[in-house]
Amino acid sequence: MADITEYLERSMQNCSLIDRRSSMGDGFGMSDEHIPISDRFLELSSHFSVPSHLEQCLDLKTGEIYYRSWNSGMRVKEDPRKSMSRGNYADQSSGESSGTVFSSEEVSSYYESEESSSESSPSSRKYHKEEQDEDVLVVAGCKACLMYFMVPKLFKDCPKCATQLLHFDQLHSTSP
């Protein structure tokens, strides 16, 4: 197992998203000197979320990151998170505001009030729980094809062979 891991690590070290030269060998005996340091790493800024109407994509041919709008399909190369933060600072310094800014207390109180109003009746609570279960992905294993899958919580059959899946979240879930 250690040999396989070591082999994969060496192979991945020789990969470059921007350099079009590819190594068909196993990666042994190659030096990293031919790959510039800037080509080895790609900053995704994944610790900040992308606005909900955009999708962050990677062009595998060029190695460039671009953003695609789900509404219009337009591609933008500039990171919208950076332009939004610059725009907000500019608006605040000029005294203008492009939208309503809520404090974290206001947002949390809004969500708490939404939860309490939607959970007022038992039928709405049951519907709300079923709706939440549809959106949750869980790990499930198939005993027949010996594979693991990420499937919606309410999904019971293996997507490959249609036998019953073994859900690994059942230890933590409460059943009625």
Curated annotation (Swiss-Prot):
Gene Ontology MF terms in the entry: ATP binding; helicase activity; hydrolase activity
Compositionally biased tracts (Low complexity): 93-106
Coiled-coil regions listed: none
Motif EAR per record, residues: 41-46
Entry keyword set: ATP-binding, Helicase, Hydrolase, Nucleotide-binding
Transmembrane feature ranges: none
Subunit and interaction comment: May interact with BHLH122/CFLAP1 and BHLH80/CFLAP2.
Function summary: May negatively regulate the cuticle development by interacting with the HD-ZIP IV transcription factor HDG1.
UniProt-recorded name of the protein: Protein CURLY FLAG LEAF 2
Gene source species: Arabidopsis thaliana
Taxonomy of the source species: Eukaryota, Viridiplantae, Streptophyta, Embryophyta, Tracheophyta
